[in-house]
Amino acid sequence: TTILDAGPGLATAASGNRLALQTPRLTIDHNDASQLSASCLAYAAHCSDAAGATLADKVVSLDWPDREAARQDKFRSQFWPYDLLRPVDFDTATLEAGIALPVGGVVHDFGRVIEPARLCQHLAGPTPVITNADIVKITRQGRGLVLFAKNGRQFNYEQIVVATGAGLPESLSQL
């Protein structure tokens, strides 16, 4: 197992995001997908905390713009666990966030503000990482794959896991 990263270090090229939010992806109809999202959020929070990647241990989701306020109103009318989705007025939102906020919203106590690069480094553990491996072409060779980097290097693997973010459609079209 080896990780190839296009940037100069693990998780440094991923759209330049130095920070990320971990929040639940709930659906209005309170279905299995929402339940899975809630479970995944608890796991993600645990992983981020264990990695030392957590910068803030809750997320305040504001009732703004109006579309988001209407969506969150529907969530507030449902029966979600209090620590997953806690309604707050603007005074409480201000207190929770530590800065003046003009509107209320909901607090996700298991939400996190994280440092993605630190989380990726923790999850990778001792797995070898090859950096500056900006893959520009993938071809099949026998039962394996050959990956060609922009700088001329080639990598041969029997199996790959592709995690290229916005570049995924282009990467998959080469397979």
What residue spans do the PLM features occupy?
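Glycine-rich nucleotide phosphate-binding loop and flanking beta-alpha elements
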Residues: 68, 137, 167-170
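Helical element adjacent to the flavin cofactor pocket in flavoenzyme catalytic cores
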Residues: 106-149, 155-159, 163-164
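Dinucleotide-binding Rossmann-like beta1-alpha1 core, especially the glycine-rich loop
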Residues: 19-97
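Rossmann-like dinucleotide-binding core of oxidoreductases
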Residues: 8-10, 21, 62, 168
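Flavin (primarily FAD) binding-site architecture
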Residues: 162-175
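Glycine-rich FAD pyrophosphate-binding loop
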Residues: 2-16
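Short beta-strand/turn micro-motifs composed of small residues
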Residues: 5, 63, 164
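Conserved beta-strand termini and adjacent loop/short-helix elements that scaffold enzyme active sites
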Residues: 6, 56, 90, 109, ...
